[in-house]
């Protein structure tokens, strides 16, 4: 856990409900600001987490994923502070069983993609609002489908102004980031049953003094 004379500032956003014919879910957000160097000291372990990336099909196949052509620590230390943002998604029928694993995976992909689209857009808007800032998305790139990423053809990214790495791609421990800094335990589906909630962990690197980010 973080050991510091100054505790990170935890902010909690009121619940947001989304009710549509296709789905119903509730979103709850928490955010915390911490010094970048302290966050690196406590949660950065690229030697360990790069191994998980290498086991993923997105490794070296997506421009937002490793390996990178820059030093991640130098990239991070351009900014003095980092906001960690935890977005909890509570499905309205969290105990609902699915007939097959494939149906469950499709549901999860559709739900998380929908929330990611809103969250990524918000983070890019915040970059424009606060100069000298950089977002980290909650997962791999969603601007292109994996098979259409230009990296597969050794070509430059077609969305260089939008693409952002995730914390895990930069080598951070997301499980302990969520539990220690946000008080959120990461949950997963099991036996084709939805968990109580899903969690997206994104971040906002900045040199600005921001009282409330989201």
Question: Which ranges hold each PLM region?
Answer:
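Catalytic cores of enzyme domains
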Residues: 25-214
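Leucine-biased recognition of intrinsically disordered, low-complexity hydrophobic segments
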Residues: 9-10
């Amino acid at each position: 856990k973080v050991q510091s004379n100054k505790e990170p500032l935890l902010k909690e956003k009121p619940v947001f409900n989304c009710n549509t014919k296709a789905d119903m879910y509730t979103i709850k957000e928490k955010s915390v600001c911490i010094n970048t160097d302290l966050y690196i000291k406590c949660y950065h372990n690229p030697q360990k987490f790069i191994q998980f990336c290498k086991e993923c099909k997105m490794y070296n196949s997506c421009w937002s994923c490793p390996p990178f052509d820059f030093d991640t620590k130098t990239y991070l230390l351009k900014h003095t502070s980092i906001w960690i943002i935890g977005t909890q998604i509570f499905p309205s029928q969290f105990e609902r069983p699915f007939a097959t694993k494939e149906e469950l995976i499709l549901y999860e992909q559709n739900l998380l993609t929908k929330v990611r689209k809103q969250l990524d857009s918000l983070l890019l808007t915040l970059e424009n609002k606060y100069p000298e800032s950089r977002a980290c998305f909650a997962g791999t790139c969603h601007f292109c489908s994996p098979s259409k990423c230009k990296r597969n053809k050794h070509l430059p990214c077609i969305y260089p102004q939008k693409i952002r790495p995730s914390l895990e791609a930069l080598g951070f421990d997301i499980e302990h980031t969520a539990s220690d800094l946000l008080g959120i335990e990461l949950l997963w589906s099991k036996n084709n049953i939805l968990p109580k909630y899903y969690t997206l962990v994104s971040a906002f690197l900045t040199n600005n003094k921001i009282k409330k980010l989201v």
